[in-house]
């Protein structure tokens, strides 16, 4: 325990600097109370950083645009739908957050147990249903403080284009899916330019890998990050055995 903590070094290295042979998990008692809530709105501004980050009882915060809802055969009259899971040991904590939400300009739908199970199951179906189409998937991330502005400008790009958006609102991770687009590269480039504008990343949870190496080159801080990674790679895997085509040219 007195040695340097190398755990962070391996996070996000995508198998280029080592591999995991054993995992030890800490578990926590289940919370006494759990509620799922669906918020629907045309204006994401109501979900500012304060609301997203200042509540420890939000265990999941998922965004589905109206196209994703329609894909699930759920009628949506709003541009954005936000599915929350709230957990607490004190029921009053959940009631307090819901009271705060009631003051926002959103439709609030408290889901019963059956409805909650159905909605969370459907949320997991979205990427599966989209994978059945001719889809190009972008896995981007922007700072939570910039997420609302980013999504507002992304809507302008979406106009008259078959683009689906869903993702993890709490950490700024948005999956942007282009469907049946014969001329998709200009749209992809436009989305990446927008991501750079808000100091975002071309990779959130699915890594840079091989396909996005050329995209990563154009993002802020790339040269310094690449130089550091290259140095670490050389010291830990000088023969380039692990993930030889990931990250590096």
For each predicted feature, which ranges?
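C-terminal substrate-recognition/cap domain of FAD-linked oxidoreductases
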Residues: 11-13, 19-190, 194-198
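Short acidic/histidine-rich active-site segments
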Residues: 201-208, 243-245
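Hydrophobic alpha-helix feature that most strongly marks membrane-spanning transmembrane helices
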Residues: 159, 196, 200-203, 234-237
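Short conserved micro-motifs on helix faces and helix-strand junctions that flank
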Residues: 9-12, 140, 167, 203-204, ...
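Short secondary-structure capping/turn micro-motifs that flank functional sites
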Residues: 67, 117, 211-212, 249
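Activity-critical C-terminal alpha-helical subdomain
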Residues: 212-249
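Shared catalytic-loop signature of beta/alpha-barrel
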Residues: 182-189, 194, 207-215, 219, ...
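Conserved mixed alpha/beta core segments that line enzyme active sites in large multi-domain catalysts
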Residues: 1-14
């Amino acid at each position: 325990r007195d040695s340097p903590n190398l755990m962070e070094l391996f996070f996000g290295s995508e198998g280029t600097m080592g591999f995991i042979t054993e995992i030890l998990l800490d578990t926590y008692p289940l919370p006494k109370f759990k509620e799922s809530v669906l918020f629907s709105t045309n204006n994401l501004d109501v979900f500012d950083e304060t609301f997203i980050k200042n509540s420890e009882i939000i265990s999941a915060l998922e965004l589905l645009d109206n196209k994703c809802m329609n894909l699930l055969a759920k009628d949506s009259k709003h541009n954005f739908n936000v599915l929350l899971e709230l957990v607490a040991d004190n029921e009053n904590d959940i009631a307090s957050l819901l009271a705060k939400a009631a003051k926002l300009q959103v439709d609030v739908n408290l889901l019963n147990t059956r409805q909650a199970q159905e909605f969370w199951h459907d949320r997991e179906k979205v990427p599966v249903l989209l994978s059945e189409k001719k889809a190009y998937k972008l896995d981007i991330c922007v700072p939570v403080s910039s997420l609302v502005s980013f999504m507002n400008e992304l809507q302008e790009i979406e106009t008259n284009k078959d683009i689906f958006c869903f993702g993890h609102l709490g950490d700024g991770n948005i999956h942007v899916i282009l469907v049946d687009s014969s001329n998709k590269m200009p749209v992809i480039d436009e989305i990446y330019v927008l991501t750079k504008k808000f100091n975002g990343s071309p990779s959130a949870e699915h890594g840079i890998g091989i396909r996005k190496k050329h995209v990563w080159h154009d993002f802020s801080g790339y040269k310094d990050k690449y130089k550091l990674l290259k140095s670490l790679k050389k010291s830990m895997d000088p023969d380039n055995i692990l993930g030889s085509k990931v990250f590096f040219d």
